[in-house]
Amino acid sequence: MSDYKSTLNLPETEFPMRGNLANREPEMLKSWTENGLYQQIRESRKDAKPFILHDGPPYANGDIHIGHSVNKILKDIIIKSKTMSGFDAPYIPGWDCHGLPIELKVEQKVGKPGHKVTAAEFRQKCREYAAKQVDGQRDDFIRLGVFADWQNPYLTMDYSTEANIVRSLSKVIDNGHLHKGVKPVHWCTDCGSALAEAEVEYEDKMSPAIDVAFTVVDKPALLAKFGVNEYPHNISMVIWTTTPWTLPANRALAVGANVEYTLVEMVKEGQAQALVLATDLYESCVERFGAESHTVLGTVAGSDLELLRFNHPFYDFDVPVILGDHVTVDSGTGVVHTAPGHGQDDFVVGQKYGLEVANPVGDNGVYKPDTEIFAGLHVFKANKNVVELLEEKGALLNHVQIKHSYPHCWRHKTPIIFRATPQWFISMDQKGLRQQALGEIEQTQWIPDWGQSRIEKMVENRPDWCISRQRTWGVPITLFVHRETEELHPDSVSLMERVAARIEQEGIQAWWDLDASELLGDEADQYRKVTDTLDVWYDSGSTFSSVVAARPEFNGHPIDLYLEGSDQHRGWFMSSLMISTAMNGKAPYKQVLTHGFTVDGQGRKMSKSVGNVIAPQHVTNKLGADILRLWVAATDYSGEMTVSDQILNRSADAYRRIRNTARFLLANINGFNPETDMVAVEDMVALDRWVVRRAAALQQELLEAYDQYNFHLVTQKLMQFCSVELGSFYLDIIKDRQYTAKEDSNARRSCQSALYLISEAMVRWIAPILSFTADEIWKLLPGERGEYVFTETWYQGLQSVALESDLSDEYWDQLLAVRAEVNKVIENARREKQVGGSLEAEVTLYADEALQAVLENLGDELRFVLLTSKTEVVALAQAPSDAIETELASLKLSLKKSEAEKCERCWHHREDVGAVAEHPTLCTRCVTNIEGEGETRQFA
């Protein structure tokens, strides 16, 4: 017989080397959808223990970006791994559909509500626009291989959800957490209405910049703080502002608790006075004030000045010093004029100190009739009058005109103001919500754990939550308020349920169409309907109740996990916590996981202007979704997540390693029937038993990593296994046995059994991450199986068996190390053309006593482990002087090219080639494998 190729067991598989994912994945998606895969998974987990991950709804506007992809893929990996762990883990995706960005898009097309279109028509247009955006985003999410009930998502604009949001608010009200107050908002005096952040543009504007002195009320108390016994002249604290018109509303002076302040005497035109200024700024200040000389009298920390009082510069009252985190020493005086009715920072810090939110300005930007001195003046015209009055009172230390960036109305292009307007709030303290929420944070697991202190600080310091907006497209605050007393209707809670029932049938328009008399009868004239809408953060923050508690898939089970970007401590995690605690006295979640933002290779934020945006659509079309999924899984999401074309190409390389491993496994179990060909683990060749043991140990590690959401560890350990234990060791060693042993021999079937077990386990390991590839592998695995890997659980067939006669795992670790050293020497010899390949080499190993015993254990099978034609083990003491040193102190090597004939079939160089006359080109091992019983292997 001259052609022995037909006697070899050569690998064969339909699993292609190239993934061609960009083209193949869409076909698989189509098949998954047509076969109702998501429903099959649900069916397979009927009555199983539930695991509920609640989807934080992305906003239904624009294309998805890479951050959306990270978020959805992380959720998908969790859902799939929990399903593999036997849980019933439904995934209902959601979208946030109300609010300003959608209004603005619709406004560009149809104009403002009440102009060319009615408010009702405008809402309908918003609804249609949001629905279209949802469709676009849904297609992009599906393309990522995310499994969800895509045909039945939740939308915050679903009639049922809108109704449940109203019901949620009624519970918050019933529990006593709502109150009415005022809050400063961006206000356009030309529009006569509030503006949202998105409607504000910043343009340069000339404004008066003034330094104003507030004289101290209790001079001895102030002097004592600075350690000064007495001072005969005036003492003042100085503020700097570019909005003189807000001074009538001043109610405090804010200093920084950790900022140092100096009491400095300034002499100007022969007159002395002492001023309190930030230490870092006093020199530039006194120079600006035109001082002829100055003397430092003392310094203190801002915290020491708290609650000292100073006289208002032109009204007959005094104001306190308060501490504010917003105070800086970048410019000005280091003291901030505080008017809670005219600034967000002022308002927040004012709430802490219970300051009056004075609002002397009407809708049209004119001071109200009861405003002392300035009644009837427009605020911007009043700047001049305020400056003149300050000069007259001797309180003006400096006045210049400056050019600076200032908020303008995007419609009128005119400067806007901050002014306090009546709003609805959820109170943090009137019913102990703050303390309750802090207690609930303690009961929640935060991943990473720094999330806990972050949200705790926010809850400790946050003001009451303003939940009202003056918008058209939003869930209405369905309240009736008494026209004279401004009190809520006493039956508000039951009235809200009746309104909710209508909204459930007709959507939010039902509220605006409702005539008060339909619900209030004769009382209708005494009450007015509230026209405000809810903050969209209330919409999304109440979905634990409006969606999860309402949908049958969740069966009333508590939510296990919220997972969003780290900005959501302030956003969705916070709003959900507040509403749930206000409604039910407990947090809505057991665990909260946050991931970092995506940045480019240089750590910069993604930005179209910088040109560093990586669009997920581009990645899936070019590389495939599995590459994007592998990048997400392999990246430690606890910090910023770096992505670039180069990084994605590295993910593609890692993917190829996994794919090549899978291909090798499939090609070598081709024709293997697990029913008839399986070798029991205890009957396997020792090396095969070892690799099954390694796979079993690895599975434990992977399952633990999945359970703890450490997906980067899953990919690291998997890559290590594919590259080191399998690629560089096991798969390399078994090729000879797999290809040359008798087809049905124990030597070969043992090896195939191990490969089969690893394949069954590995396809499940990768399924949550490389979903498309896992499905492809699953369909090519031998043996009876269900249609999809995704309905399976983790593989139970990996038995960690070690026989008494077995070589220990430490032993195999030593062999791995020895083989690595031998490989280096052979590679070197190949480079220097001493040998053509490892089978041309004959190697002598000089080992110390312990290692010698280990190596000699294997007998003649050591050569199969080292992939050489011949190996000899000799005592280290006998090593010649030219023996090659290795990184193992216990081992030296020598290598020579074999002079023996090469076997045509197995390519080993053996002395016995041609010993059997009928097969002159074969070694006796190959003859046994072709014609005899076949070789037996014990170790490798």
UniProtKB/Swiss-Prot annotation:
This is Isoleucine--tRNA ligase. Belongs to the class-I aminoacyl-tRNA synthetase family. IleS type 1 subfamily. CDD domains: Anticodon_Ia_Ile_BEm, IleRS_core. Its main location: cytoplasm. IleRS has two distinct active sites: one for aminoacylation and one for editing. The misactivated valine is translocated from the active site to the editing site, which sterically excludes the correctly activated isoleucine. The single editing site contains two valyl binding pockets, one specific for each substrate (Val-AMP or Val-tRNA(Ile)). It is an enzyme of class 6 (ligase). The keyword Iron does not apply. One of its GO terms (biological process) is isoleucyl-tRNA aminoacylation. Keywords: Aminoacyl-tRNA synthetase, ATP-binding, Cytoplasm, Ligase, Metal-binding, Nucleotide-binding, Protein biosynthesis, Zinc. It catalyses: tRNA(Ile) + L-isoleucine + ATP = L-isoleucyl-tRNA(Ile) + AMP + diphosphate. It comes from the Bacteria. One of its GO terms (molecular function) is tRNA binding. It comes from Shewanella pealeana (strain ATCC 700345 / ANG-SQ1). It is found in: Cytoplasm. Monomer. Pfam families: Anticodon_1, tRNA-synt_1, zf-FPG_IleRS. Its EC number is 6.1.1.5. A motif ('HIGH' region) lies at residues 58-68. Its cofactor is Zn(2+). ATP binds at K608. The keyword Cytoplasm applies. The gene is ileS.
